[in-house]
Regions:
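N-terminal "arm"/small-domain region of PLP-dependent enzymes with the aminotransferase-like
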Residues: 2-61, 69
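Conserved small-domain helix->loop->beta segment predominantly found in fold-type I
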Residues: 273-276, 280-282, 287, 291, ...
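Short hydrophobic/aromatic beta-strand micro-patches
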Residues: 223, 347-349, 409-411
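Conserved N-terminal alpha-helix of the aminotransferase class I/II PLP-enzyme fold
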Residues: 39-91, 113-121
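Glycine-centered tight turns that cap/initiate beta-strands
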Residues: 76, 148, 315-318, 366, ...
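PLP-dependent enzyme catalytic core of the Aspartate aminotransferase-like
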Residues: 1, 119-120, 128-129, 147-150, ...
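Short loop segments at secondary-structure junctions
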Residues: 34, 225-228, 350-353
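Conserved PLP-enzyme active-site core in the AAT-like
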Residues: 9-18, 81-312, 320
């Protein structure tokens, strides 16, 4: 069933899987590693990428593909690939078009794990990264580019600094330098922001967060808009535009057109590196996606109330939440986010600094101290001690993380109960 004219709420329920007569209404779990064919030639056609189908779940599985298609539809992309984690998604998204000797430019205010991936791990593979201030001018961002730059990377809403990305600015710089803009859209989700509509080329997600919503599965997604012209810059992206010796000389852009990028990531990287999620995890993810619009709306409503409460409290020195009119990124949120809604995550600092933050967190009763974020239950974390612990002081400043910053992931409980829990904990801070 074609879903292009339906609203996102409807796509969350119906896109990706349309049952035929007598088939299950719920997405089936294809719990199988392998798939049967009648002849050796049929199987051979699959291995040569000359036919569509399934032969081994490490590359593709019907359950996984249905969910990937749903997320691609939500983002307005042409194709998608699910991975075993958000980190795997970001790694694949970059490594699919980068190799030893290449260079990446990335916003500095990104999740600590991604910062380490780009700044440390990829360096071991011969891929260098230059970090730029997300608020830098287009000229300052452009100055970080080198002749061997292949990618510009950023997050729509930075974790945990909550910087709102000026997507059009970043897209313009990327395209002027003939590279794609890859945007991690985890916090915003396609319910609140669709980066392709503002010039981004590839979107990634940690589906572990709002898309799942219940902290029961770990996963990631890569979605391609199909808009970046790889052939126009074939001298840079020869992995897509020149013959792949591992598939008897197939040229991805020639054979797969707008789906070349995702096809290469699936048939080459997933084949060699794995990182495929289990069909059961994808089934759970699909259940989360079905209620995503309802949950995102409630998360944002609750977060707005909590942010206003914190902003007015005498023990809170400052609150970072773009839903507040006095927030630095309020105008960008109004521009890029549906109805100005961003996410359910708030960052704030207490007047007593780091010690007060510890006392506050240890006094919470309803909210859980947990590494996770963007789940249905309220959770709290101290980034400098947890997610960004591997950074030095200078790197923390560049990432927008102060020593006393608290990251609060507001759940979908009663807003009154959440605020009362915070109020009691603040008395002990």
């Amino acid at each position: 069933m074609m879903m292009s004219h339906y609203d996102l709420e409807t796509k969350c329920l119906h896109s990706g899987y349309t049952p035929k007569k007598g088939e299950p209404c719920a997405l089936p779990i294809y719990q199988s590693t392998t798939f049967k064919y009648d002849t050796t030639d049929e199987m051979g056609q699959l291995f040569d990428l000359k036919a569509e189908g399934y032969f081994y779940t490490r590359l593709q599985n019907p359950t996984n593909d249905a969910v990937a298609a749903k997320i691609a539809d939500l983002e307005g992309g042409v194709a998608g690939l699910l991975t075993s984690s958000g980190q795997a998604a970001n790694f694949y998204a970059i490594f699919n078009i980068c190799e030893a000797g290449d260079h990446v430019v990335a916003a500095s205010t990104i999740y600590g794990g991604t910062f380490n991936l780009l700044g440390v791990t990829l360096k071991k593979l011969g891929i260098d990264c230059t970090f730029v201030d997300t608020d830098a001018s287009a000229e300052e961002i452009a100055a970080a580019f080198k002749p061997n730059t292949k990618v510009l990377f950023a997050e729509t809403i930075a974790n945990p600094a909550l910087v709102i990305l000026d997507i059009e600015k970043f897209a313009k710089v990327a395209h002027e330098h003939e590279v794609p803009l890859i945007v991690d859209n985890t916090f915003a989700t396609p319910i609140n922001c669709r980066p392709f509509e503002w010039g981004a080329d590839i979107v990634t997600h940690s589906t572990t967060k709002y898309m799942d919503g219940h902290a029961v599965q770990v996963g990631g997604a890569i979605i391609d808009s199909g808009n970046f012209d790889w052939d126009a810059y074939g001298h840079k992206y020869h992995g897509l535009t020149e013959p792949d010796e591992s598939y008897h000389g197939v040229v991805y852009t020639k054979q797969f057109g707008k789906k070349a990028y995702i096809t290469k990531a699936t048939t080459q990287l997933m084949r060699d590196l794995g990182s495929i999620p289990s069909p059961e995890n994808c089934f759970l993810l699909n259940l989360g996606l079905e209620t995503l619009p309802l949950r995102v709306e409630r998360h944002c409503e609750n977060a707005q109330k909590v942010a206003e409460f914190l902003d007015a409290h005498e023990k809170v020195s400052h609150v970072i939440y773009a839903g507040l009119p006095n927030d630095k990124y309020h105008e960008l949120a109004q521009k890029y986010m549906d109805k100005g809604r961003t996410c359910g995550v708030i960052s704030f600092e207490l007047t007593g600094g780091r010690d007060a933050a510890v006392r506050f967190m240890d006094s919470l009763k309803l909210a859980n101290i947990a590494t996770h974020v963007a789940a249905s239950k309220t959770m709290v974390l101290h980034p400098a001690s947890h997610t960004h612990r591997q950074m030095n002081d200078e790197q923390l400043r560049e990432a927008g993380v102060s020593p006393g910053m608290i990251r609060l992931s507001v759940g979908i409980e009663s807003a009154k109960d959440i605020i009362n829990d915070l109020k009691e904990a603040l008395e002990n801070a």
